[in-house]
Regions:
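A short, histidine- and acid-enriched strand-loop-helix "catalytic/donor-clamping" loop
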Residues: 9
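Metal-dependent phosphoester-hydrolase catalytic domains
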Residues: 12, 16, 26-36, 41-121
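Active-site-proximal beta-strand elements of phosphoester/diester hydrolases
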Residues: 1-6
Length: 121
């Protein structure tokens, strides 16, 4: 299980950060062992800088048969984008969810909604 929070401003920092995390996921985890990488990547799904992650791992949102494509960033009600991801390798994504329907007693508990994955391995 790996987690990261990539830079939110610099394009080069995003690209290099994603490449580093992808590379380290391959180096740290032996072949055949399930890997799950979660995090605020601070990039929209069509950002080319996610390419290195998608080469090393699968995007759970894209491969899960049951998938939630709602936004994960709410900007405290002022913005709505997909910035949070779960990537996996050597496991099968079953269901990807954005947890934004619960009532926590406040309109927003964070500027991001949690994401969840049901997987088998």
């Amino acid at each position: 299980m790996l987690n990261t929070h990539l830079d939110h401003i610099g394009k080069e920092a995003k690209r290099e950060g994603a490449a580093l995390v992808a590379r380290r996921s391959l180096e740290l985890v032996p072949d055949g062992v399930p890997v799950f990488l979660t995090g605020d990547m601070n990039m929209l799904p069509d950002n080319e800088s996610l390419g290195s992650l998608r080469e090393a791992l699968e995007d759970a949102r894209e491969v899960a048969p049951k998938s939630d494509h709602r936004t994960t960033f709410n900007g405290w009600g002022n913005d709505h984008r997909i910035l949070d991801y779960i990537f996996l390798r050597n496991a099968k994504a079953v269901e990807f969810s954005v947890l934004r329907d619960a009532d926590y007693g406040a309109p927003y508990i964070s500027d991001h909604y949690p994401v969840a994955l049901t997987a088998t391995f």
